[in-house]
Amino acid sequence: SVHRHPLEVSARASEAGDGSALVVVVATEGSTYVRPGAMAVFGADDTQTGWLSGGCLEPEIARRARHAVAGGYLDAMDIDTRDDEDLFAGSAVGCRGRLHLSLLPLDRLPGWASLVQAWWQGAGPLSLRVTGDGVVSARAGDAVRTWTLPVAASAAADVAGELVVPLPPRVAIFGAGPETRMLVAWLRQLGWHVTVVERRARWIPDDEVADAWCIQSPEDALAALRPAPDAALVMHHHFEHDREALVALAETAIPFIGLLGPV
């Protein structure tokens, strides 16, 4: 999922009121680096989380995002790189498409973090809708928020748009071992929500490694995990523990089950 890191950063920025803007792609045409639903967070200190192009469009987007935050208003951008004149003039940016962006100042969206948290916990997809008169509404499961913001007088495009961010993919890892920390880090970096199911004391870490840690039997953990995982990995390095997990997993509809074992 490309949404985990921008949304996590946007939640922290909203709570901190640190002058960041969330920029979301609400529509595209032609050849673009991203599709509708892509997003990035632009911070007041020139930090950026997420990409909307190969790097050619971000400087102008960041400039407009800073103005939106400073003015406390919604803004929109319509970036069209399909003009043949750009190719002949040598100013083409490497893609021939159109992006329609909505720019939202996170300081003006109190409670945004609770929606991101509900989405992350599996309450439901995160829907976001912006109307032309500045009403922003968002929902994740039963969590609903609505805000009304002024619209930039200089908005180069209609600010209206809507998108739905699907739930992040979820994986349950049954059994921990020496490779767990690295594997979990990779999965989280790729946007997965990671739960480790492990009862053996020697493998239970003192610090936060996964998004969730279940000190339960595989059967009890699977009964408790909601929503159900999209994938499961069995890797106890122990025959009986692996067998116990596989027996429990055989009763589920999880579409992918992987088993780590000797070659």
Residue ranges, per PLM feature:
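A short acidic, amphipathic alpha-helical/loop segment
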Residues: L183-W186, E244-T252
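Segments forming oxygen-rich coordination pockets for charged ligands
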Residues: S1-C214, P227-A231
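ADP-ribose/adenylate-binding Rossmann-like module
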Residues: A231-A232, H236-H237, V247-V263
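Short amphipathic alpha-helix with an adjacent loop that forms part of the alpha/beta core around
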Residues: P218-A228
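Short glycine-rich, flexible loops that bind phosphorylated cofactors or substrates
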Residues: E240-D242
